[in-house]
């Protein structure tokens, strides 16, 4: 069972609290959809100033919408298109301070102004991406990126 907590202490301590919660949520749960759904809900609960958080799964050809929290979203994203497709194709995290200045940005929600995307890779294979949008410009920084990369690594072990 999930218990809400007040995140206290340094930012690093709070990030560690979220990672611990994720580990508890996915422990011995083999279902990929359940784990991705709970990870999305946990991040939506923890992160401030975001308007969308979720996963797109790679089907061998393109990214397909997976579990998420937020408004309805674009269903399919080709590799190399937009922030999500770029992250998936290049298999690297992409942090964008102003999505309107990103070439080829796909606007699923007009309220989004910044975005961070983390690839989900297991055994060298692309599984999908974690996508988080914010209505604020420059919402995500290096510490957010490091935290989210660590969270995705923990999650990937159970996928």
Q: For the regions a protein language model found, what residue spans apply to each?
A:
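A generic structural signal for residues located within well-ordered alpha-helices
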Residues: 31-34, 79, 112, 143
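Short hydrophobic/aromatic beta-strand element in the GNAT-like acyltransferase core
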Residues: 52, 117, 129
């Amino acid at each position: 069972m999930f218990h809400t907590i007040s995140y206290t202490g340094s930012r690093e301590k709070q990030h560690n609290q979220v990672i611990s919660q994720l580990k508890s949520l996915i422990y011995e749960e083999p279902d990929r959809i359940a784990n991705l759904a709970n990870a999305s809900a946990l991040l939506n609960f923890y992160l401030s100033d975001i308007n969308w958080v979720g996963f797109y799964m790679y089907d061998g050809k393109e990214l397909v919408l997976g579990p998420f929290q937020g408004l309805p979203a674009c269903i399919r994203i080709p590799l190399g298109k937009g922030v999500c497709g770029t992250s998936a194709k290049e298999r690297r995290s992409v942090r964008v301070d102003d999505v309107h200045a990103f070439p080829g940005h796909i606007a699923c929600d007009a309220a989004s102004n910044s975005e961070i995307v983390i690839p989900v890779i297991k055994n060298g294979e692309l599984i999908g991406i974690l996508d988080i949008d914010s209505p604020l410009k420059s919402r995500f920084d290096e510490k957010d990126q490091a935290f989210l990369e660590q969270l995705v690594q923990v999650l990937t072990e159970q996928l």
